Amino acid sequence: MFKRRTLGFLLSFLLIYTAVFGSMPVQFAKAETDTAPAIANVVGDFQSKIGDSDWNINSDKTVMTYKGNGFYEFTTPVALPAGDYEYKVALNHSWEGGGVPSQGNLSLHLDSDSVVTFYYNYNTSSVTDSTKYTPIPEEKLPRIVGTIQSAIGAGDDWKPETSTAIMRDYKFNNVYEYTANVPKGYYEFKVTLGPSWDINYGLNGEQNGPNIPLNVAYDTKITFYYDSVSHNIWTDYNPPLTGPDNNIYYDDLKHDTHDPFFRSPFGAIKTGDTVTLRIQAKNHDLESAKISYWDDIKKTRTEVPMYKIGQSPDGQYEYWEVKLSFDYPTRIWYYFILKDGTKTAYYGDNDEQLGGVGKATDTVNKDFELTVYDKNLDTPDWMKGAVMYQIFPDRFYNGDPLNDRLKEYSRGFDPVEYHDDWYDLPDNPNDKDKPGYTGDGIWNNDFFGGDLQGINDKLDYLKNLGISVIYLNPIFQSPSNHRYDTTDYTKIDELLGDLDTFKTLMKEAHARGIKVILDGVFNHTSDDSIYFDRYGKYLDNELGAYQAWKQGDQSKSPYGDWYEIKPDGTYEGWWGFDSLPVIRQINGSEYNVKSWADFIINNPNAISKYWLNPDGDKDAGADGWRLDVANEIAHDFWVHFRAAINTVKPNAPMIAELWGDASLDLLGDSFNSVMNYLFRNAVIDFILDKQFDDGNVVHNPIDAAKLDQRLMSIYERYPLPVFYSTMNLLGSHDTMRILTVFGYNSANENQNSQEAKDLAVKRLKLAAILQMGYPGMPSIYYGDEAGQSGGKDPDNRRTFSWGREDKDLQDFFKKVVNIRNENQVLKTGDLETLYANGDVYAFGRRIINGKDVFGNSYPDSVAIVVINKGEAKSVQIDTTKFVRDGVAFTDALSGKTYTVRDGQIVVEVVALDGAILISDPGQNLTAPQPITDLKAVSGNGQVDLSWSAVDRAVSYNIYRSTVKGGLYEKIASNVTQITYIDTDVTNGLKYVYSVTAVDSDGNESALSNEVEAYPAFSIGWAGNMNQVDTHVIGVNNPVEVYAEIWAEGLTDKPGQGENMIAQLGYRYIGDGGQDATRNKVEGVEINKDWTWVDARYVGDSGNNDKYMAKFVPDMVGTWEYIMRFSSNQGQDWTYTKGPDGKTDEAKQFIVVPSNDVEPPTALGLQQPGIESSRVTLNWSLSTDNVAIYGYEIYKSLSETGPFVKIATVADTVYNYVDTDVVNGKVYYYKVVAVDTSFNRTASNIVKATPDIIPIKVIFNVTVPDYTPDDGANIAGNFHDAFWNPSAHQMTKTGPNTYSITLTLNEGTQLEYKYARGSWDKVEKGEYGEEIANRKITVVNQGSNTMVVNDTVQRWRDLPIYIYSPKDNTTVDANTNEIEIKGNTYKGAKVTINDESFVQQENGVFTKVVPLEYGVNTTKIHVEPSGDKNNELTKDITITVIREEPVQEKEPTPTPESEPAPMPEPQPTPTPEPQPSAIMAL
């Protein structure tokens, strides 16, 4: 224990300190590199009291001062008047994220006028003020002092004046903390306040108390805490576990599909290959681990146990492993089931199911995906890394004006619209009500004259551009310009040419080394086709199906069975379009429509084969197919399609049009490529860097790490030949032009500025750099390279702007395409992520040791591709495991040169630009061959390694781990001998070694074969095992066995010998004359094998260590037991010896019955229902004269046994779910009641056959409280209503809740969203942002049901909602103000009558507005605080009428009552005559 220095010493020190340093204050200034992470200012209704305006986020008067370490302060310049206030902190003068705190405002109460200091910490988002919190002064901040200081680099041990382990209160809760990386070891420490011992606290928070011990078992990060109120001191260090604790540490669980240590090999695997899956847990945390996987092909779920394979080198983690292999192609979905005592955890994929690091949950959540593909799957070598060019034929080039106007009609008898001006915009009937519209209002009937001859004329242009594959949109006869509505599959459309033109184009392309892919549309035809003939235009040919139906007999048409026409003449049209009648399915497949299958697939000249080999001339045929709406045609059809084209051109491309994960269609029996829209969307999300709806998908900004995760997700799911042949597009005929996505549209006055174009072009160039450097087949949509712009269909199909091209952009594309073509490494080199942080993404490609990723021979080459979407910066890229030091690179774009030094390469990247670094030719990048005969010999305190010399090796590197397959650490380098002795080992631990060979240039070979070693003390003897006496059976009466072990140098020290393993073995010998029938179960074979349990150290016995273990015998009769010990992880065992000290000795004892010999009463086991992937058992309770101990569950594959015990449950449990079953397999079960004396009574036997049963999936959703009464729907990839927002209407179950039950097959990978009947009313995120599709895997959670509980945050059509008052509300004259109450999205800028304020965390806001008499108009405006988004910007006007006050009439005064006077009599006058008059009243 540390002893305090004497007072005299301290006084002497202080005198010297004062004399030397005098008046120098002790300062704890922030580091120079600690710059403010943001501008923070306090805003609230106090601002007007200091000469500002309330809630002014743009104020420069309340900007907080940055103090370092994330801390900010602001003190009011004057005293605030007494009263109540509200405030919060705004960042960067914006309400983005809703301010800090995000939930509501903070209150401030002042009893008297006061100056107030506000405190904020950026790192913890904590806010407070001086009325609630008083910090410890800087000079008195607590600090850690002790033997730990030097270990963590915090000054000299036990010297507070040198301690840099300063603790800070990051959350303003009077708890100060400090975090450090602490090496393994034993330490003692205390906490002092300030740089002296004047005030210090030790164990239990006692002032001047004892030192605090800290025993750290492995290198780890530890946070130290000090409570300034209680003075308690603690850490967050969790010492290693020693056994089950009914708890699983979720934060320590890990499975990373992108890390070969956790999943090897990476990515999709071939049939017959073995994949190794591993999961990490806190050491000693798990009692068992299993993997549960669903097989998409067999439709079964299987559980396989995992085995513990070792621990991490620092002892912090343990690892469990399972190996799987499949001899058939399939797609596997897996998760882990982890148990520790009574606790069960599940570990599956992350919420987005992108692979990589997963997530632990209490219930089954998301599955990881594993693709198993046919080992024979391949693509043509010319396809891997080729550059594709997609052409929409009518819009590319007019090479033959004579065929421009050969059509009289388009669809039916609609007219054809021919353009005279090549540079016209396509007719867009959406614009028919706009001024200047000149079209005819008919969709897809306008033509420009582009044709096959035009493509032929431009082949040299394409060759010069670097194109090696052309993909043609449909060219067969059709009434429309897009030609996805085929009229005749056997003919080239007359506006495009004829068969001879086609053959010439194919031959000319092939002569230039260019392959051609055709577009096949086999889900539907045109209603105006020779096959359907809705309009009766082809009556001179064979009768069309529709005309035959009209004649009352559809079978009269040779095409009659292709379509299903209902009695009323209706039929299924693709996505509801009656112009596109769908080919029907029989028994789930179009292939079962024989005449259709023969026409497309089976006949010698079937369409699938003919156009690859027209008239027997392969050179005059195309080279493969792109296949439209591939997922809307039965897979069986495509399997036969593949077999057919393989007879003409083996492995010819079959490119599927699929917009999501296509892995299930890429297993090897059909498609071998896909239109990679996943790639497109990820690249756009990264580069565009803002939310944008392109008509197909809403893009949301992501950083480089998320980009890498999404790209790696594709890489790991697709078979390797497919991944290197995917059609990596940025745009197509179905998407908005990429230049317009990036912000430029020449025909839109809001997007056609030079500034917009410059920015869009920079973004496009950046995307092209990524596209041309990445594995796959990059695809250019015609004209993109020339600056073509255009919005949604049909605007994305403008004519190629010949003569008006963007020459600079064309030259750039030519350059970047040819960089790819000239460097094989960019085509078939391997792929490794090198840097993914913020705005910068970098990946590497390699051909080393003379082999590419497919094992083909090519010269060595290395490439590094870097893209930067942000500001200019210097990027340090770690190349330690990628390429050796000294390799020189040249940027093929800029010409700059770079060299790898000290394991990194530093690349300067300008804003919105990139680099393609190619290693200079002539450098030696071929490493020596790997060592194959490494050997290890274990000794006491050392491991001896040896191997044979390798050609060209000048030295060797030694690597060490504790588990096979990874976690290697280099422990020695530049070893020049072919032997090595490792003495830095701990006896009793397992080590794994591998060695690499290094040549004179520094090229390092692959790892050698792995060898295990177990250095250990030698065990000399084990014995002194006690004799167990006759034992009475009982659940609470265990047998205790003791034994001793001696190992020189290990057990002769005080305490337990390190890493010694001790185990007790026991087994049942026989009844020994006892009546054991009460303990037995009929049909269960008595286990007479040894059972081994761990023993624990209980103390020293001289030079020996003493161990003890317990077990509970459950049968009367004779039992045998023995103890064994191992000092080398169980590689060798020493058993307890007899009296001679040499012979292994097992001892026996007798177990006799207790006084309770009465078995439990019988129990009834119910017949289980049929469930998928599980059997649920239920039984009646059993009783006993003493007590029931529990129930044992037994299982067999035969009714007569043998039965095997699979579980034991407590006496209060009357059910059990067995998930270790296979659908379709028969199982038998019995349940046995066991009492406290192990008397047993068995139930009846039941038979169960789990099988695939549709699962009732119950979707419950909670919607915002302002949701209108128009209902809620669930839309997704349901087969019966594919992404239909008005289908699947839910039932209202509460004020804000809806529910629906759908029947789905187990294993279904469902994606869905909630809407209110329309995509205009789809759900949104809490910030109003677009959210990703929700995803679930359908599983049986019990009783063939699954419950999904979701919450909708917001709706697209309601960015703001006003609860009250309603528009045109009338209030009485006495109401002089009214409260506006509403709800809006987080981070919104809300103003009411141009006055801004902040909404609460849940989006609710209230604002009181004054009312004048009469009509009051309140203007409410909301908009996002970041980029403008029209969808999130809305204005609402609320009219409130305040009644005028009622004007009361003045009352008529009442005279006082007086007696009326009596008039004197008067004579009656005689009036003079008067004219008539109207008396005015």
UniProtKB/Swiss-Prot annotation:
Ranges of residues in domain CBM20: 1250-1357
Signal peptide stretch: 1-31
GO MF assignments: alpha-amylase activity; metal ion binding; pullulanase activity; starch binding
EC number: 3.2.1.1, 3.2.1.41
Domain Fibronectin type-III: 927-1018, 1159-1255
Residues given in the record as substrate binding sites: H524, R626, H733, D734, D793, R797
SUPFAM superfamilies for the chain: (Trans)glycosidases, E set domains, Fibronectin type III, Glycosyl hydrolase domain, Starch-binding domain-like
Matching CDD domains: AmyAc_CMD (cd11338), E_set_CDase_PDE_N (cd02857), FN3 (cd00063), X25_BaPul_like (cd12962)
Residue ranges of the region described as Disordered: 1441-1481
Binding residues for Ca(2+) 1: D245, N247, D285, D340
Gene3D superfamilies assigned to the protein according to its UniProt record, in alphabetical order: Glycosidases, Golgi alpha-mannosidase II, Immunoglobulins
Active site: D628, E657
Chain residues that bind Ca(2+) 2: N398, D400, N403, D404, G449, D451
One Pfam family this sequence matches: Alpha-amylase_N
Positions of the record's site feature: Transition state stabilizer: D734
SMART domains assigned: Aamy (SM00642), Aamy_C (SM00632), CBM_2 (SM01065), FN3 (SM00060)
Family note: Belongs to the glycosyl hydrolase 13 family.
The protein's name in its UniProt record: Amylopullulanase
Organism: Thermoanaerobacter pseudethanolicus (strain ATCC 33223 / 39E) (Clostridium thermohydrosulfuricum)
Source organism phylogeny: Bacteria, Bacillati, Bacillota, Clostridia, Thermoanaerobacterales
